[in-house]
């Protein structure tokens, strides 16, 4: 239950111009959920967006896209989730209708649904993400770990796509959080 009507959120107004502002807590549609943010991570995309902008996002826009939290409101048509569930929420969901989705390349989807604005106290999760890319956490997983599930899944996907096996010799050019997650995931 939410006992107030407003929240704080981060908004990127321009390169290197991020501001905290107050806004109404979003109202959800029947197929959406509202999640109280527990942990929101900062990834390379966030840093690049902050430093030089991002072609798909024109300022001002809500900031952040990877997080975990607790469901505080569930839309009337949502199945499989309830108020109080601890969840990890990925940042996109494919349309499942375009050429790329039909050919197993969902990451290239022409109509991805994005979840932006996770640098906020409460996050409204769009229906396609609720249906495809939101997961109830096991009791043994904390929110810090859960907030890294999306980038970790990118690392695992990369390993699978490259068909890397234990004992293979590979060369990696570059370094960053995804590379670190690839290293700890060892096939």
Task: Explain the meaning of each model-derived region.
Residues 8, 32-34, 169:
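Residues that mark the start of a beta-strand
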Residues 26-40, 53-99, 136-140:
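Glycine-rich beta-strand-centered segment in the early N-terminal region that forms part
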Residues 95-173:
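NAD(P)H dinucleotide-binding glycine-rich loop of Rossmann-like/cofactor-binding domains
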